[in-house]
A protein has these predicted regions:
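Acidic, surface-exposed loops and disordered segments
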Residues: 1-168
Length: 168
């Protein structure tokens, strides 16, 4: 699934299927409980997306996942792990995503959360992409690692997984 997932910034004007919304909400709830987070899927709304991101997407983003949680030393790590889980899960459901990074409106996103005592750390745009995105230029395993002797399969698999995790 990692190899199939690419950033998509432009989306079709098509509401998310209600069954997919239910599946996404269940996965979000599972991650929220396991990692003490406050993620939330917002549908048919773009107020959590920054003006710049809206320009980049031609105003096609209509759904997003709020990435938030209570302040703690591991918040960024937990958000990164669970955010990656959600973008790969969305891809497995036939949806496309864009981790908007710093291009979000935290105040507007916070309005959708019951708990206002959290830090909104970003949003992930989600929907049916106009395209499936394009792969980024990738480095070879030799360019990002070094192993003396015969390289075992587990090492190459780990390097490949590590690299893909970095470019999500």
């Amino acid at each position: 699934m990692i190899e199939k997932r690419h950033t998509v910034r432009k989306y079709l004007d098509k509401p998310l299927d209600v069954d997919l919304v239910s599946l996404l909400n269940a996965r979000i709830e599972q991650n929220n409980k396991l990692y003490d987070l406050t993620f939330k899927l917002v549908t048919n709304e773009s107020d959590g997306i920054s003006s710049l991101a809206k320009i980049m997407s031609n105003n096609t983003v209509q759904n997003y996942i709020i990435l938030a949680g209570k302040e703690c030393s591991s918040l960024d790590e937990k958000i990164g792990y669970c955010g990656a889980d959600l973008i790969l899960y969305a891809q497995s459901l036939g949806l496309n995503t864009w981790w908007c990074g710093g291009m979000f409106n935290g105040k507007n996103a916070l309005k959708h959360l019951d708990d206002k005592d959290v830090r909104v750390n970003g949003v992930i745009a989600i929907g049916y992409g106009k395209t499936q995105g394009v792969p980024h230029k990738s480095k070879t395993a030799d360019q990002i690692s070094h192993y003396q002797g015969v390289v075992p399969d587990w090492f190459n698999a780990g390097i490949k997984l590590y690299y893909w995790h970095q470019v999500l």
